[in-house]
């Protein structure tokens, strides 16, 4: 607790002495961006603005478009392999793994670039990162338009790499947007909405490509279908970039919560490298980084390899593979929102994290052993349960990290969580692809189930150290003390004024 008090004392307004030597709070002249606490006459101004819903909606839309570009090629991996076969390796494993890299490049690009992008987020703020992400997202989409030829897989990979760089400026923003724009009882819900946009994009990426680009023996027909898909995507993402330029703002005129006001001051005072060091010294956050990476990495591996997993049991069902992916994501959207609302009401971060992790593992086991039944409706049901809990874990992990690492920047902690997810996503995708080719799909699914079991066990060792909640309680206590002092002083002053009058009346 002493650590939290020291952090608060550095970021609270200065104390001065008022009448009768009592301490009163005065304005901190060095507070940035006009968010200085003014407690000499009243409480600090905190306010939520209606614009916050426009900001989070716009973020959801362009996050959705980037997530769509992540998976829209791999859900039709067999068709992409057929069309670009002339520019792919001859060896089967290398050829399939090369196509898998259209998804894994998102994971690979994130790992080395997360640190400079997080530094940019902390130094330049939300608007700069939003502009960078939206611009690169649109640029990558237009580059794909130039890839319509069987010998241009290298250009397609380059375009996908540009989109992968764009997501670096997107994935770390939900918790930051929630903290900067939303009130204390809306933070978890807002974070869930931020993740919601990303998941809707994945859902569209699963559903639409198998419909727009059906399997065909004619390469010309496949090329025409790909062209329609790429042009439509490029136009939509260009519109979003223009909207971000016009609408997206850095922060509201006043902070939405007292905790955010204090956190903002600390971000300006603390060095980014020192913030990273503080996070790495936090054992609970270290464990959470690994377990979050494992859970989300499993989700990435399943999403990337869903096409071969489903086609192994249901040949020729490309559209069913996309619909199963859609089911996973839609159920996950419900899970994300439900988890956010649950956290806002209960604040039971560790218990919720552990419970969802265990249920994710149970859902994966059910999915694994129902594929053999050859009943698509059962597969859809189990996929929905898997998605509800596995995707519902994403915002819970962000918020748990923000709680146990306060007052460090939410952008930094969520960025490290995402970097871990990308790392484990690459390892698990390559490992599962090798298992599919050498052992079979069952072995691949068992590998993911076992990995989730290990992650569940490790999650139990994370301490429930809710620093953000404690900080909020302490600042409210200090404000109550200040208000009591001011009330006491006013009553004393009234008494001193009233005494001479009563004497005059007696005379």
Residue ranges of model-derived segments:
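Cytosolic juxtamembrane N-terminal segment immediately preceding the first transmembrane helix
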Residues: 2-68, 73
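Extracytoplasmic gate region of multi-pass secondary transporters
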Residues: 73-74, 282-334, 394, 428
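Conserved MFS/SLC helix-loop-helix module at the cytosolic interface between two early adjacent transmembrane helices
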Residues: 112-153
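Helix-to-loop junctions at the C-terminal end of transmembrane segments
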Residues: 112-126, 335-348, 436
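Cytoplasmic helix-loop-helix junction between adjacent transmembrane helices
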Residues: 157-197
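Glycine-rich segments within core transmembrane alpha-helices of 12-TM secondary carriers
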Residues: 186-214, 237, 418-428
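Symmetry-related core transmembrane helices of the 12-TM Major Facilitator Superfamily/SLC fold
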Residues: 227-246, 443-461
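C-terminal transmembrane helical hairpin of 12-TM major facilitator-type secondary transporters
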Residues: 347-397
């Amino acid at each position: 607790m002493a650590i939290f008090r020291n952090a608060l004392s550095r970021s609270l307004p200065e104390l001065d002495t008022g009448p009768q030597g009592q301490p009163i709070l005065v304005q901190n002249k060095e507070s940035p961006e006009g968010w200085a606490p003014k407690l000499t006459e009243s409480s600090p101004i905190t306010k939520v603005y209606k614009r916050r819903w426009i900001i989070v909606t716009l973020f959801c839309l362009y996050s959705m478009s980037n997530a769509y570009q992540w998976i829209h090629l791999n859900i039709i991996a067999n068709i992409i392999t057929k069309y670009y076969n002339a520019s792919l390796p001859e060896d089967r494993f290398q050829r399939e793994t090369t196509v898998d890299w259209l998804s894994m490049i998102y994971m690979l690009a994130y790992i080395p670039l997360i640190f400079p992008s997080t530094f940019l987020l902390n130094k330049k703020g939300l608007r700069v990162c939003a502009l960078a992400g939206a611009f690169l997202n649109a640029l990558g989409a237009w580059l794909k338009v130039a890839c319509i030829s069987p010998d241009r897989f290298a250009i397609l990979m380059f375009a996908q790499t540009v989109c992968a760089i764009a997501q670096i400026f997107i994935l770390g923003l939900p918790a930051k947007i929630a903290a900067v724009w939303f009130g204390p009882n809306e933070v978890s819900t807002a974070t869930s909405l931020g993740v919601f946009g990303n998941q809707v994009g994945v859902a569209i990426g699963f559903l639409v490509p198998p419909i727009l680009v059906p399997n065909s023996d004619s390469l010309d027909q496949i090329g025409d279908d790909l062209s329609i898909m790429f042009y439509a995507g490029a136009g939509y993402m260009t519109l979003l970039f223009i909207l971000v330029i016009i609408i997206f703002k850095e922060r509201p005129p006043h902070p939405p919560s007292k905790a955010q006001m204090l956190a903002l001051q600390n971000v300006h005072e603390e060095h980014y490298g020192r913030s990273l060091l503080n996070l790495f010294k936090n054992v609970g956050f270290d464990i959470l980084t690994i377990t979050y990476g494992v859970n989300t990495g499993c989700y990435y591996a399943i999403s990337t390899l869903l096409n071969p997993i489903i086609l192994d049991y249901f040949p020729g069902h490309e559209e069913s593979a996309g619909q199963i992916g859609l089911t996973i994501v839609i159920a996950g959207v419900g899970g994300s929102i439900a988890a956010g609302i649950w956290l806002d009401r209960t604040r039971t971060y560790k218990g919720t994290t552990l419970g969802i992790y265990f249920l994710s593992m149970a859902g994966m086991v059910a999915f694994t052993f129902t594929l053999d039944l050859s009943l698509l409706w059962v597969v859809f049901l189990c996929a929905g349960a898997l998605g509800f809990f596995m995707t519902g874990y994403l915002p819970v992990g962000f918020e748990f990290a923000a709680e146990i690492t306060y007052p460090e920047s939410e952008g930094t902690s969520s960025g490290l969580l995402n970097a871990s997810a990308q790392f484990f996503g690459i390892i698990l995708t390559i490992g599962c692809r090798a298992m599919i080719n050498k052992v079979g799909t069952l072995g691949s699914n068992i590998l993911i189930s076992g990995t989730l079991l290990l992650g569940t066990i490790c999650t139990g060792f994370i301490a429930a150290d809710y620093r953000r909640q404690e900080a909020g309680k302490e600042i409210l206590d200090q404000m109550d003390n200040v208000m009591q002092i001011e009330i006491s002083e006013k009553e004393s002053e009234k008494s001193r004024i009233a005494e001479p009058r009563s004497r005059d009346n007696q005379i």
